[in-house]
């Protein structure tokens, strides 16, 4: 959830996209429609935000962010968080996965 929030906030703070801090509501879903393990995050994001002067500004575009830009930012942050968690021991590698395989998945 942190990777999603930080990605949205950092990109939308850029005047090229919004230049403001948006409102964000996020929900973590851990299952898919077929009741299989499928963790994913849904985010509702306001179509505007609060600028540095404290004013609400509307989005300049029909979409807040280009898909590729958000995808790259989120993937980079998520892989970084996962790498740090594995390195620190906060996230344990599954027994049948080697450290090399885990590392290759995160790069």
PLM ranges: what are they?
Residues 1-107:
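Beta->alpha loop/short-helix hinge microenvironment recognizer with preference
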């Amino acid at each position: 959830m942190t990777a999603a929030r930080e990605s949205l906030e950092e990109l939308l703070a850029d005047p090229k996209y919004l230049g403001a801090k948006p409102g964000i509501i996020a929900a973590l879903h851990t299952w898919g429609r077929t009741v299989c393990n499928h963790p994913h995050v849904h985010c509702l994001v306001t179509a505007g935000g609060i600028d540095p002067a404290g004013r609400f500004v509307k989005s300049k575009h029909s979409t807040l962010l280009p898909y590729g830009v958000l995808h790259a930012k989120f993937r980079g942050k998520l892989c970084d968080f996962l790498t740090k968690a594995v390195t620190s021991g906060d996230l344990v590698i599954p027994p049948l996965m080697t450290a090399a395989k885990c590392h290759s998945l995160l790069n």
